Amino acid sequence: MSGRPRTTSFAESCKPVQQPSAFGSMKVSRDKDGSKVTTVVATPGQGPDRPQEVSYTDTKVIGNGSFGVVYQAKLCDSGELVAIKKVLQDKRFKNRELQIMRKLDHCNIVRLRYFFYSSGEKKDVVYLNLVLDYVPETVYRVARHYSRAKQTLPVIYVKLYMYQLFRSLAYIHSFGICHRDIKPQNLLLDPDTAVLKLCDFGSAKQLVRGEPNVSYICSRYYRAPELIFGATDYTSSIDVWSAGCVLAELLLGQPIFPGDSGVDQLVEIIKVLGTPTREQIREMNPNYTEFKFPQIKAHPWTKVFRPRTPPEAIALCSRLLEYTPTARLTPLEACAHSFFDELRDPNVKLPNGRDTPALFNFTTQELSSNPPLATILIPPHARIQAAASTPTNATAASDANAGDRGQTNNAAFASASNST
């Protein structure tokens, strides 16, 4: 494989990108303590394109891969930590990850604060730098900690993490955006507050029915069977399959479908779900004609998991890990599943005694795929709290343009109240 950093996905059929006039403008100075301060001209992630100077310091590498490099830095004006994802930019096209992230504003999705371009060491090499929320942990590292201690993640955390993941998916799917790389490594966590944020939209794409997509997408262990069958007209339900794999992994303490190749992966899936029927294969990929699998019966889900696994967790898994893409629950339906009922209890707390993070501040955008589900998703105590905090007419206008992040959408609460 080439050592050249992989670019993130690019939007097709785009005109060449015009770089901002301040492109490549990067100044380095020293603060009073002698620390290196970098000042760039950056554009805010949301809102109008109004470039502004942003200064940061204490830069250090915290991750790298085929996509590029991720740095941690501290903003000089606020002292907040941020992550800066630096990726190779093809100047001929708009960067799809940037285009998608500028649309998104949700409490369970990592926020794009700014972006800026920088020059490479070689002539004509350009980098896109995404300045993102810094979140200290990942579901992958937390789960690995428990696994190494021969323990499983406490079920309350499984509920909190999966619920927030499904909320983030319901939100992006409402825009027709498919993440295409759901895995524990891409689920950021604040261990103190239990807030989860979905990150890394480098593989994400707005899916359009009838337009082909690459099937070699998504990380192994989490690839939906239709991708293994080579489907190119798949839907956002591939994210739901991946989320089901994450749920199963948190319950088991190890991946449910490990495999070093597509064939290995399929064998592992068949061991649990049984051999897919011809109809199921047709639903996954109508063009797939090879059918040479041994006939294996499905393994009972109750025997896949440990004896003390909550029945509701097993039931939810079985509704996510379905061969037929249309048979899988939608993310919003998953949020409404009885496995998450404990989170809707007004007295539930985190194990550390803190309140749970915001779980019911649904927006009309989030609920758009199935508005009646608001009656389940927004419990009575949350509706009462929302009604008590409803802004007066004088302040409502000023709040009208507030984003989704952490904002209580009173229209959503009202619809829930009216439906009950």
UniProtKB/Swiss-Prot annotation:
Positions of post-translational Phosphoserine modification: 9, 389
Biological-process GO terms, alphabetical: cellular response to interleukin-3; circadian rhythm; epithelial to mesenchymal transition; extrinsic apoptotic signaling pathway in absence of ligand; glycogen metabolic process; insulin receptor signaling pathway; negative regulation of calcineurin-NFAT signaling cascade; negative regulation of canonical Wnt signaling pathway
Low complexity bias (residue ranges): 387-401, 409-420
An annotated Gene Ontology molecular function: ATP binding
Regions annotated as coiled coil: none
Task: Report the CDD domains cross-referenced here.
Answer: STKc_GSK3 (cd14137)
Disordered: where is this region?
1-35, 387-420
**Which Pfam families does this chain map to?**
Pkinase (PF00069)
- State the GO CC annotations: axon; beta-catenin destruction complex; cytoplasm; cytosol; glutamatergic synapse; membrane; mitochondrion; nucleus
PTM Phosphotyrosine: list the residues: 216
Q: Would you tell me the protein name for this molecule? A: Glycogen synthase kinase-3 beta
Organism this protein belongs to? Spermophilus citellus (European ground squirrel)
